[in-house]
């Protein structure tokens, strides 16, 4: 199981109260059974002693609590009610539930190639790639994780199809509840996620019934009845999700603007709302047929206790439900800002009292790993300084942090503050002061201190995964980019080892101080008029529409 500080702390706490051999099972360990005491408790469990709590927004009340004025009522249980409850003649016949079909009974391990330290391409065709490896760190566990992506080329950028796919996803989730619950009880999970240009299937857990779980999920997606009632529920969920996004706290709303810009293609919320109302069951049916029949590629990544033949068999099972034309692999697209020098400022009025400002700085011209290595190390250095300055010393806001971020293949630094007392204008003034002071601190940093920061980052990157999920995650970026060498992380580590203090200074000077690359500021302005002054950023373009903004940038393929 994945380790955590809370888990370790809990074990230490148990050691103070129980013998070492019982620190895990102590809630279930008993030395003797007191039958008399148990029977005495059971004898008290009668209708005469019962207390029933009913929570219902339609319940009739006649009292209020003293301090919070919460409405409530107290009623005695009538003799007629008791008699009705004790009449068992109308009770349905009780039956044991059907056996969970996903419980594992075979925990044997597959014979595997222990020398395979990264996923290996075990099958390749024009529109098919299958990568697999046994777990290097958890090879003694009968578990695996597998991801299967079906892509459709050429890709479309169509609002109706995008909304239809999202609604179909909600509808599918509604009918998959039983399978998902059974799988979770059996120590497994699986998902079918979709967009207008493809489907991703994922499953993890004990391997004995993993293929069956995936097959059941796929077949249910293929065959479930599309009804007006389910569509109405899906539309409600979609609208509720849009409503939640509009009611998020100030900083989340500010950050969401940059996230939406980086996620191509994006459609404005107002357009999504209008389209939701137009979608019919025919649109949903067309989308399902498209996803089931129009795939042009299948890409698979499996890590864990699955043999190569088992992985291939799962892929074959997928293609019995989702038709793969096996014609073209497309690894996806991204918004390219690498050469951009545009400065953007998005301002949004929100219904909260708080304000938030988040601003992201990106360099110009760095390749992906060169930029990522510098941004990662600078984040480790600046994040504590930023928090100590704006949060601890200046008490500017209760949410203050700096971190490295990425749009497409370009990495940069992002600074975020949410404040109940400062306007976006004041936050930006403190940012500018902090940036200048930090440049001086970076220049004055000793070689020894710089080496400590670098060693700390390398230790984190070289830390062994603590779960199969973490081990799988190490390969996801390379897999999604089509890098069959799976050496993205190894190259990043080598670059960080070679970084000098001057490399960091140059990156900071160009990115933050001189702002030679792309900059995106996002302000969420609350309704408190005393602190509603926006940051007027010289030379920045005002952004009115993220959807329109995306059209001004080149879209590239990985």
Model-derived segments and spans:
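Short beta-strand/turn micro-motifs at beta-sheet edges
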Residues: 133-137, 187-191, 286-289, 345-349, ...
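Non-catalytic, conformational "gating/processing" segments within enzyme and secreted inhibitor domains
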Residues: 49-50, 281-318, 516
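His/Glu-based metal-binding/catalytic segments typifying zinc-dependent metallopeptidases
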Residues: 3-26, 56-58, 72-167, 326-385, ...
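Short alpha-helical segments and helix-capping/turn motifs at coil-helix boundaries
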Residues: 33-40, 130-133, 285, 502-507
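Glycine-centered hinge/linker elements that transmit conformational signals in sensory
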Residues: 314-329
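M16 family metallopeptidases and their MPP-like homologs
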Residues: 1-38, 51-53, 140-223, 231-278, ...
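Extended, domain-scale alpha-helical bundle/helix-rich regions
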Residues: 41-51, 57-60
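In a subset of proteins, long, contiguous C-terminal domains/tails are tracked
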Residues: 284, 497-558
């Amino acid at each position: 199981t994945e380790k955590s500080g809370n888990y370790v702390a809990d074990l230490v706490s148990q050691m103070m109260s129980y013998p070492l051999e019982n620190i895990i099972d102590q809630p279930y360990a008993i030395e003797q059974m007191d039958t008399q005491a148990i029977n005495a408790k059971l004898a008290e469990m009668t209708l005469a002693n019962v207390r029933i709590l009913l929570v219902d927004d339609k319940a009739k009340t006649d009292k209020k609590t003293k301090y919070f004025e919460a409405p409530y009522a107290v009623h005695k249980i009538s003799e007629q009610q008791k008699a009705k409850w004790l009449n068992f003649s109308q009770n349905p016949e009780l039956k044991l539930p059907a056996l969970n079909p996903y419980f594992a009974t075979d925990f044997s391990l597959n014979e595997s190639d222990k020398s395979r330290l990264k996923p290996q391409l075990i099958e390749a065709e024009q529109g098919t790639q299958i990568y697999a490896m046994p777990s290097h760190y958890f090879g003694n566990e009968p578990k695996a994780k597998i991801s299967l992506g079906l892509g459709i080329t050429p890709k479309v950028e169509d609002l109706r199809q995008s909304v239809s796919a999202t609604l179909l996803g909600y509808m599918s989730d509604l009918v998959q509840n039983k399978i998902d619950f059974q799988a979770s009880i059996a120590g497994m999970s699986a998902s079918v996620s979709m967009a207008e240009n493809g489907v991703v299937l994922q499953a993890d857990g004990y391997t004995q019934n993993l293929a069956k779980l995936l097959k059941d999920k796929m077949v249910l997606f293929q065959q479930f009845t599309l009804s007006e009632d389910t569509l109405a529920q899906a539309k409600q969920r979609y609208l509720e999700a849009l409503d939640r996004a509009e009611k998020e706290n100030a900083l989340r709303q500010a950050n969401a603007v940059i996230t939406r810009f980086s996620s191509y293609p994006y459609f404005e919320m107002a357009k999504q709302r209008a389209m939701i109302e137009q979608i019919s069951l025919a649109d949903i049916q067309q989308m399902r047929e498209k996803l089931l029949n129009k795939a042009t590629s299948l890409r698979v990544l499996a890590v864990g206790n699955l043999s190569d033949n088992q992985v291939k068999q799962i892929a074959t099972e997928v293609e019995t439900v989702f038709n793969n034309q096996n014609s073209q692999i497309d690894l996806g697209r991204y918004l390219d800002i690498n050469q951009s020098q545009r400065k953007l400022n998005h301002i949004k009025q929100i219904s909260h009292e708080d304000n938030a400002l988040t601003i992201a700085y990106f360099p110009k011209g760095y390749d992906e790993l060169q930029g990522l290595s510098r941004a990662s190390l600078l984040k480790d250095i600046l994040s504590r300084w930023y928090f100590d300055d704006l949060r601890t010393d200046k008490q500017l806001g209760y949410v203050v942090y700096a971190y490295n971020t990425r749009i497409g293949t370009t990495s940069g630094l992002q600074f975020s503050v949410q404040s109940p007392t400062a306007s976006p204008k004041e936050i930006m003034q403190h940012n500018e002061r902090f940036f200048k002071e930090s440049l001086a601190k970076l220049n004055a940093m000793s070689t020894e201190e710089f080496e400590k920061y670098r060693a700390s980052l390398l230790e984190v990157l070289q830390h062994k995964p603590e779960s199969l999920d973490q081990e799988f995650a190490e390969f996801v970026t390379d897999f999604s980019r089509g890098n069959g060498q799976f050496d993205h992380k190894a190259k990043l580590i080598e670059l960080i080892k070679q970084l000098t203090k001057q490399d960091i200074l140059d990156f900071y000077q160009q990115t933050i101080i001189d702002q030679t690359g792309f900059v995106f500021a996002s302000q969420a302005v609350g309704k408190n008029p005393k602190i509603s002054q926006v940051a007027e950023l010289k030379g920045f373009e005002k952004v009115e529409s993220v959807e329109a903004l995306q059209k001004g940038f080149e879209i590239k393929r990985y």
